[in-house]
């Protein structure tokens, strides 16, 4: 039986000032240790789901709703236990900073958990080293670059020892190079620490790297599956109003021209290499 760190059943949520559900009766699961990406347009309900998984919001619309995180069912009594297991990195790290220096900010969550001073110093040093920000521990967060700020935000999450990290559009304010570096860092941290990643984004090219994709539209879950399964379904992509990543655009055009593309060719790099090999045989 597959070990799911998150199980969601019949999740619905409507904000008090709205008559339309932000999330409308959706069910899904997130395998432990996986990278799952939720895609959809602005206003589709993505960030609402992030806040529901972390207990920032509590669902009341549907009595059948179940949110289970790491074996704990979310209720008003258990939401703090859930928050010990889940960390969220938001779009704008400035909104998360509370400390005067980088090390103070990373230590904030530990202070709230009454961690001893000596243990706190060890943890702060370790997580800043993991995100390559140890040289900036005495710096003021406001003077860091966008990528550096996200690294500090990630360190603050790592410090509390979560099982699940939610990336809520956390690379959307970075340039392409900065985005690539942060995503690569998170992948390395995932492998090193055995983390589960739940990435919320409208960047289709980011979603290609996931193990599993969820497609959301107007609060409804349209589909779930591997990136290959999602992006090879052109009808689904069109109905969700999404664009195909460059790799799939090129691949689909080649297939239409009756050029066979092996299943193992699943990235731009592999496609370029394969086409070069084909060209050399002509």
Swiss-Prot record:
GO terms for molecular function: ATP binding; ATP hydrolysis activity; ATPase-coupled transmembrane transporter activity. Keywords: ATP-binding, Cell membrane, Membrane, Nucleotide-binding, Translocase, Transport. PROSITE patterns: ABC_TRANSPORTER_1, ABC_TRANSPORTER_2, CBIO. ATP binds at residues 40-47. Residues 6-243 form the ABC transporter domain. Its EC number is 7.-.-.-. It is found in: Cell membrane. It comes from the Bacteria. InterPro entries: AAA+_ATPase, ABC_transporter-like_ATP-bd, ABC_transporter-like_CS, ABC_transpr_CbiO/EcfA_su, ECF_ABC_transporter_ATP-bd, EcfA_1, P-loop_NTPase. SUPFAM superfamilies: P-loop containing nucleoside triphosphate hydrolases (SSF52540). One of its GO terms (cellular component) is ATP-binding cassette (ABC) transporter complex. It is a peripheral membrane protein. Pfam families: ABC_tran. Belongs to the ABC transporter superfamily. Energy-coupling factor EcfA family. Forms a stable energy-coupling factor (ECF) transporter complex composed of 2 membrane-embedded substrate-binding proteins (S component), 2 ATP-binding proteins (A component) and 2 transmembrane proteins (T component). ATP-binding (A) component of a common energy-coupling factor (ECF) ABC-transporter complex. Unlike classic ABC transporters this ECF transporter provides the energy necessary to transport a number of different substrates. This is Energy-coupling factor transporter ATP-binding protein EcfA1. The lineage of its organism: Bacteria, Bacillati, Bacillota, Bacilli, Lactobacillales. The gene is ecfA1.
